[in-house]
Amino acid sequence: MASWGQGVEVAFAGQGASEVVNEILIDGPSGNKLAGTFLLPEGASPTHLVPAVVFITGSGLQDRDETIFGHKPFRAIATTLAQAGIASIRCDDRGFGKSTGNGKLATTFDFLEDAKAQVAWLRSRPEIDPKQIGVVGHSEGGLIGLLMSQAPDPAMNFAVLLAPPGISGGEILVGQSADMFTKMKVPPIQLAFTLEKHRQLIDAIVANADEATLTLAMRALVDAQLDCVAKPKPPEATIELTVKQGLAQVSSPWMRTFIALDPAPAIRHISVPMLILFGERDVQVSPARNLPPYQDGILACPVKPVIVIVPKANHLFQPARTGMPDEYAAIKVEIDPEVLKKISDWVVSTTSSQPSSQPTGPISAPPSVPAASPKSSP
């Protein structure tokens, strides 16, 4: 079940086409409501079915456009796809924006179920081809897309993964530390010691160690990190507060799941057409660490994904100088136009070659789309 807002036709200047934007409210799997935007390309109808995608955001609670520093990459991709004849829905994460539910206690697997609910909703729409529904996932959203692609019963028909993790979250965190301290020119012996302390903390979290063990491991890591960056060390009270805050972060259900979840087994069971993009200068999900598991794993896949490294692109697929997050806001380009074109061209090509559910005979009149009452508007 879902409620609709009034359909609003929006013309995109210079494109010579119009799309229909609807506000929607989808029932989630945990009693939560997922508020979002349903974007239909011009001409979509029960007599002219169109492919569609679900957008899945990266880590941290985010809105439907994956807004960051004023950039709205998901809106840009959705608009580009609509102009190519592809419908989409993009929803606020549970517990964020207009969506309900407890996002702070949700894990990757809860967001996976939310994505499946959105795919199911699309399959129920009379304008959408149920055999041509895919996902576009970024970062953690790419991991969720990977998990949805599994044989023998994939949850969708194709996927675009943008900067998907290929290693566990724990290894990603250690790798980020390694990159950061390397850029700071920390001596190799000191760097190795700090990374070992980080791995010991990760191992303790995965082993579900008791609070005392986690506290000792966190304190050892904080001390090692401070030795790399702070001379002299801050006051003891400041260090203790840092340890306390760190423990709170790693104790959340989401973080524990993220740290332990290894994508490698899932990569070997990809069963739908897939486009995987990495940014050459991504320092959050670096291709140097995350690409090799895909290159190795797809050797056993019944369907071989297309993998592309985008030159000079950062984690948000902006053209970048260093790829560091402190550049994101300063870069005026929302998302590299070549990335938009690559995604659009691949989705159009893939759906054009897939089986379709296009009607071939007479069809009854489509059901009307009710305007939402003030109470049911998301």
Question: Where in this protein do the model-derived segments appear?
Answer:
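Accessory cap/linker subdomain of secreted extracellular hydrolases
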Residues: 160-269
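Short beta-strand element of the alpha/beta-hydrolase
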Residues: 48-58
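Short beta-strand/loop motif that positions the catalytic acidic residue
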Residues: 270, 276-278
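Alpha/beta-hydrolase active-site loop
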Residues: 105-126
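Conserved alpha/beta-hydrolase
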Residues: 76-98
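Short glycine-enriched nucleophile-adjacent loop
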Residues: 142-153
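N-terminal cap/lid segment of alpha/beta-hydrolase-fold proteins
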Residues: 7-48
